[in-house]
């Protein structure tokens, strides 16, 4: 009985150890985040927008990387979308069927640029990517 229990534990434990070794953000995600953060479109704000913060990070669960900028902006969503409809393609981004969503190959994966808002006077411009090339907007 003890031997069977140990065999069962070892059988379950090996995949769990492999999973834990693969869990979380690492050097590849850090490098991708640095590349995304340098994308010029993050600094291409509409007229009248004031940058509040720049940020980047990685979600350990799915290793999704984000780099973004938050702006104080008094304009409308239509004005913001119109602005990025010109600024994003000028920086190499392609439009999609989703308003405010653009795609571009960055560091060997497909990155998604999302323009959100303004909501409560805040405009978010984010680039999201993962090594699985997931559809992110």
Describe each model-derived feature in a short phrase.
Residues 1-137:
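An acidic-aromatic pocket/loop used at catalytic or ligand-binding sites
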């Amino acid at each position: 009985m003890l031997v069977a229990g140990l065999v069962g534990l070892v059988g379950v434990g090996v995949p769990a150890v492999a999973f834990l070794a693969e869990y979380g953000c690492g050097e590849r995600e850090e490098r991708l985040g640095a590349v995304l953060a340098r994308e010029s479109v993050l600094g291409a704000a509409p007229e009248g927008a004031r940058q509040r913060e720049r940020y980047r990070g990685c979600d350990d669960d799915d290793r999704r990387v984000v780099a973004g900028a938050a702006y104080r902006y008094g304009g409308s969503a239509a004005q913001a979308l119109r602005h990025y409809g010109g600024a994003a393609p000028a920086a190499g981004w392609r439009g999609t069927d989703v308003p405010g969503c653009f795609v571009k190959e960055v560091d060997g994966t497909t990155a998604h640029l999302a323009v959100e808002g303004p909501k409560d006077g805040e405009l978010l411009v984010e680039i999201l990517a993962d090594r699985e090339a997931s559809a992110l907007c």
